[in-house]
């Protein structure tokens, strides 16, 4: 088990070490909630989230990159939320086919500049608007690919944070 100090350790030495292990875990959960409920929810759950049993009550931090740290701080609570978020992903994947995921498309009107780099990872399912550089389109299939790549990155960062503290990864 990690101590609170180990969970919250950060460093300015590397870009990947600016978020603690706790924040990495929290971001894994919030990322799933943001993508699948906030961004895709109106298409995937047009009648609300009742079928998801209480998943309409999660709160994001004001920064929007992780869960509200006033409510979701303890690692055990974060892991429950991560499990709930993964349950949403599982529910969607069980309800969709590859073909249906390729047909569903989300219009993003506030696409951040770092998506220029992310776009290179998506040979299908992601495209830019012809004129407006802030608008992009992403399919549900590409969204799950993005979530997968993000999860690998954050899990790897957790391992690096542990190693940087002299903890076996």
Model-based region annotation:
Residues 21, 75-82, 144-147:
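Hydrophobic packing residues in well-ordered alpha-helices of helical domains and bundles
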Residues 141-166:
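A hydrophobic membrane-anchoring alpha-helix module
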Residues 1-22, 38-51, 66, 92-107, ...:
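Helix-loop segments that flank and shape redox-cofactor active sites
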Residues 31-102, 163-169:
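Short, helix-capping/interhelical loops that line the mouth of catalytic, cofactor-
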Residues 1-6, 23-41, 145-153:
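Alpha-helical bundle segments that constitute or directly flank the non-heme di-iron/ferroxidase center
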Residues 112-113, 153:
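Charged, low-complexity intrinsically disordered terminal regions and linker tails
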């Amino acid at each position: 088990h990690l101590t609170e100090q180990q969970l919250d350790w950060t460093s300015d030495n590397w870009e990947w070490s600016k978020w603690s292990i706790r924040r990495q875990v929290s971001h894994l959960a919030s990322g799933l909630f943001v993508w699948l409920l906030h961004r895709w929810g109106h298409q995937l759950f047009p009648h609300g989230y009742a079928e998801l049993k209480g998943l309409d009550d999660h709160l994001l931090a004001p920064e929007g990159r992780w869960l509200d740290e006033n409510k979701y701080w303890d690692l055990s609570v974060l892991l429950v939320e991560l499990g709930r978020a993964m349950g949403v992903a599982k529910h969607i994947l069980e309800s969709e086919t590859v073909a249906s995921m390729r047909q569903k498309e989300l219009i993003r009107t506030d696409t951040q500049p770092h998506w220029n780099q992310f776009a290179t990872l998506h040979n299908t399912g992601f495209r830019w608007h012809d004129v407006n550089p802030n608008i992009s389109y992403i399919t549900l299939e590409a969204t799950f690919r993005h979530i997968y790549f993000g999860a690998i990155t954050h899990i790897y960062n957790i391992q690096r944070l542990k190693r940087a503290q002299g903890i076996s990864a």
